[in-house]
């Protein structure tokens, strides 16, 4: 297996060389605009027609489903039409803190030991095995700044993001500011439950343009359009004389799901096909889930060992709905939650639209690499699970779009090769013409896929959550989840993209399971923990 991986790396180096040659032969340094979105599962835009997409269940009518996707994410679709979409992209860890720390430092969670949100600790302060492993890591903007790039950000890029120090200032950023705004008073929905908050923000006439995320995007768009913008005495300033790395962090659709009425009205609950059959399907999906994984879902077992409702946020929401209305209150609560999540996705999309408008109106569009990612996925009831914090695709698969102005042939293309957010760091450095600053950075340069989305790619995606011994490995066809107690899940992702049928231990996949296990061993060894 190591021989196959080495062959891939050698073979792809030729394509990388071609890509780098096109990027650096007499060209001015590339600008980077990075857009980060919190808790956005691949649900709208180009993903809506994937057979495993959650919208397929909520809106089984294709015409209506297309309309809903267009209401939800028209601007993200616009970016997809301009660049390449990675259809099988994964986070390094399905939680904000480890995912973002890994992406920004290039160091994998099973290597740093940061595999959970860890109480919100600042990533540089996190200690694993007696070592602050990320304390002196060079982040992507930090390294670019060292080599002459102007770096600036607003919004959530790192997990701790609303104050100066925990946004990694002044190491990562030349300039940083927290732009805040509100559409008005928040009115909770009667259907919200413990641990889950949603409702309407502002009065009925309030516009999404007043919301916090949109104002952040407007600020950054103004920087691009006019060359500068100021907030609270901090001025961002860009010019053609210096390459820049601008990062916009969009908080929605992270909880709480508060949205303005103009966006909530786009997703009437009457259009949703939420049924007890769907609920029962997700409950029964737990019949072959390893015991350890029950910690991550709303599943429990009765005395016979059959799956029943447990105590996840999702099942708590269902019970709260029944306390309001014993006649389908659980389904009504579910639909109401989805309405507010979808509207929150639309907030993120409108912010994306504003920053894309700003770039298109600026003099930098032809020389700016645009990267949009979500830090992880988000379960909305699958396996009776809600939020992230699991190694199933609902929580682990992400949005990942790249618009490379120097590879216009990739516009509208899709790549089904498995990739990871950990690959962004080496890709940006490759396109910037810089060597990697740290041997602990073990992601892969994605530029061959910019040139040819179907290029040979034998590197799997790998994720870790909860402990360095809980890992997922994903090829284009298969997936293995290995838990710290020895439990595992194996899925045929071509035949079973929703991960209903756990094949672990079955004779039909003995060889495949062994191959996946070997791939996982290689991935772990490649980025194993060391205090050196």
Predicted regions located by residue number:
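A short aromatic-rich beta-strand->coil structural motif
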Residues: 32-40, 156, 245-248, 398-401, ...
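A short beta-strand-to-alpha-helix junction
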Residues: 28, 64-73, 90-94, 129-137, ...
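Active-site segment of extracytoplasmic enzymes that catalyze sulfate/phosphate-ester chemistry
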Residues: 41-138, 143-149, 163
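Formylglycine-dependent
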Residues: 114-152, 157-264, 268, 319-332
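A long, amphipathic alpha-helix that forms part
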Residues: 214-232, 325-368, 523
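C-terminal cap/loop subdomain of S1 sulfatases and analogous C-terminal strand-loop tails that border
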Residues: 219, 229-230, 376-382, 410, ...
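Histidine-centered active-site microenvironments of extracellular/periplasmic hydrolases
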Residues: 48-54, 357-413, 420
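Long, internal low-complexity/basic segments
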Residues: 23-30, 37, 42, 85, ...
């Amino acid at each position: 297996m190591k021989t196959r991986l080495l062959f891939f790396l050698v073979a792809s180096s030729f394509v990388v060389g071609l890509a780098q040659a096109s990027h650096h032969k007499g060209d001015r340094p590339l600008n980077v605009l990075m857009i980060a979105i919190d808790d956005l599962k691949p649900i709208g835009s180009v993903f809506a027609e994937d057979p495993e997409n959650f919208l397929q269940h909520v809106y089984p009518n294709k015409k209506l489903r297309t309309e809903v996707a267009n209401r939800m994410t028209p601007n993200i679709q616009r970016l997809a039409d301009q660049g390449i979409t990675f259809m099988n992209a994964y986070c390094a860890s399905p939680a904000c803190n480890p995912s973002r720390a890994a992406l920004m430092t290039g160091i994998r969670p099973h290597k740093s030991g940061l595999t959970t949100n860890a109480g919100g600790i600042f990533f540089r302060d996190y200690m694993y095995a007696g070592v602050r492993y990320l304390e002196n890591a060079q982040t992507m903007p930090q390294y670019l700044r060292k080599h002459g790039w102007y770096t600036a950000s607003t919004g959530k890029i790192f997990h701790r993001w609303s104050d100066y120090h925990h946004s990694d200032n002044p190491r990562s950023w030349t300039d940083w500011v927290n732009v805040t705004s509100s559409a008005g008073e928040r009115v909770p929905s009667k259907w919200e439950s413990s641990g889950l908050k949603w409702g309407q923000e502002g009065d009925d006439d309030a516009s999404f343009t007043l919301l916090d995320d949109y104002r952040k995007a407007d600020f950054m768009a103004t920087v691009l359009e006019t060359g500068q913008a100021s907030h609270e005495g901090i001025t961002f300033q860009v010019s053609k004389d210096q390459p820049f790395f601008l990062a916009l962090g969009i908080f929605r659709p992270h909880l709480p799901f508060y949205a303005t009425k103009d966006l909530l009205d786009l997703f009437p609950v009457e259009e949703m096909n939420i049924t007890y059959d769907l609920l029962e399907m997700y409950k029964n999906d737990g019949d072959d889930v390893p015991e350890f994984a029950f910690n991550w879902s709303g599943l429990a077992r009765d005395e016979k060992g059959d799956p029943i409702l447990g105590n996840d946020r999702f099942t708590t929401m269902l019970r709260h709905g029944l306390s309001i209305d014993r006649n389908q209150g659980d389904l009504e609560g579910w639909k109401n939650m989805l309405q507010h999540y979808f509207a929150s996705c639309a907030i993120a999309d409108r912010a994306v639209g504003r920053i894309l408008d700003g770039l298109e109106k600026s003099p930098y569009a032809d020389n700016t690499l645009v990267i949009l990612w979500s830090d992880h996925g988000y379960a909305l009831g699958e396996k009776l699970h809600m939020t992230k914090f699991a190694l199933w695709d609902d929580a682990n698969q992400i949005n990942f779009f790249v618009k490379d102005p120097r590879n216009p042939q990739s516009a509208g293309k899709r790549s089904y090769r498995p990739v990871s957010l950990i690959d962004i760091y080496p890709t940006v450095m490759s396109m910037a013409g810089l060597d990697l600053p740290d041997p602990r950075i073990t992601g892969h340069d994605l530029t061959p896929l910019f040139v040819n989305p179907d290029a040979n790619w034998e590197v799997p995606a790998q994720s870790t959550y909860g402990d360095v011994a809980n890992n997922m490995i994903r090829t284009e066809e298969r997936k293995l989840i290995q838990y710290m107690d020895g439990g595992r899940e194996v899925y045929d992702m071509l035949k079973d993209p929703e991960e209903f049928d756990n094949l672990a231990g079955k004779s039909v996949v003995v060889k495949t399971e062994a191959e996946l296990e070997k791939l996982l061993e290689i991935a772990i060894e490649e980025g194993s923990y060391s205090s050196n």
